[in-house]
Curated annotation (Swiss-Prot):
EC nos: 7.1.1.-
Protein name: NADH-quinone oxidoreductase subunit B
Originating species: Methylorubrum populi (strain ATCC BAA-705 / NCIMB 13946 / BJ001) (Methylobacterium populi)
NCBIfam families: nuoB_fam (TIGR01957), PRK06411.1 (NF005012)
Primary gene name: nuoB
Function: NDH-1 shuttles electrons from NADH, via FMN and iron-sulfur (Fe-S) centers, to quinones in the respiratory chain. The immediate electron acceptor for the enzyme in this species is believed to be ubiquinone. Couples the redox reaction to proton translocation (for every two electrons transferred, four hydrogen ions are translocated across the cytoplasmic membrane), and thus conserves the redox energy in a proton gradient.
Subcellular compartments: Cell inner membrane
Length: 195
């Protein structure tokens, strides 16, 4: 009795997942977001969506955030890593810009010195409203390792208002990406008038 080889029709390569799968739930990340759940249920029922202008503007704003780098130290390396293909922050609607007049978000990454503080404030003032600030890393959050130095500002929130703090020394690219997602959630919850 000879053994005959059997050929399976299953692919040799695992199929690529659609979106980033959350290991805890087995569903794509953001699938439990109440905003997207309500939109998909309304579209499934009627085929069109009824919303207010305020909600529409907030939805568009969260999907088209333009960020400006203010890399002052080693945290800037992780900030650059976030925009590379592995994490690809642009798929979340978060794209880099080179000019403060075209950007909505400033990421302060690194140690802010007393000499650099006026330049940071000047760049912040050039950004159009509504503008947001993400403080990235221990040095930007509170001075970090150089907290007791005479030339270091003990947190960039003493110079500009900060919306999201990302802790770490340096924080990973995943932590910064999570901070971006938190900022988008904060924008969705805040109206267009108040800020």
């Amino acid at each position: 009795m000879a053994l005959t080889p059997t050929f399976s029709r299953a692919p040799d390569i695992a199929p690529a997942p659609k979106g980033i799968i959350d290991p805890a739930t087995g569903r794509p990340i953001g699938a439990n977001d109440p905003t997207f759940l309500s939109i998909s249920s309304e579209l499934a029922d009627r085929g069109f969506l009824v919303t207010s202008a305020d909600e529409l503007i907030n939805w568009a704003r969260t999907g088209s955030l333009m960020w400006m780098t203010f890399g002052l130290a080693c945290c800037a390396v992780e900030m650059m890593q976030m925009s590379m293909p592995r994490y690809d922050c642009e798929r979340f609607g978060f794209a880099p810009r080179g000019s403060p007049r075209q950007s909505d978000v400033m990421i302060v990454a690194g140690t802010l010195t007393n000499k650099m503080a006026p330049a940071l404030r000047k760049v912040y003032d050039q950004m159009p409203e509504p503008r947001y600030v993400i403080s990235m890393g221990s040095c930007a959050n509170g001075g970090g390792y150089y907290h007791y130095s005479y030339s270091v500002v003990r947190g960039c929130d003493r110079v500009v208002p900060v919306d999201i703090y990302v802790p770490g020394c340096p924080p990973s690219a995943e932590a910064l990406l999570y901070g971006v997602l938190l900022l988008q959630r904060k924008i969705r919850r805040t109206g267009t008038i108040e800020r």
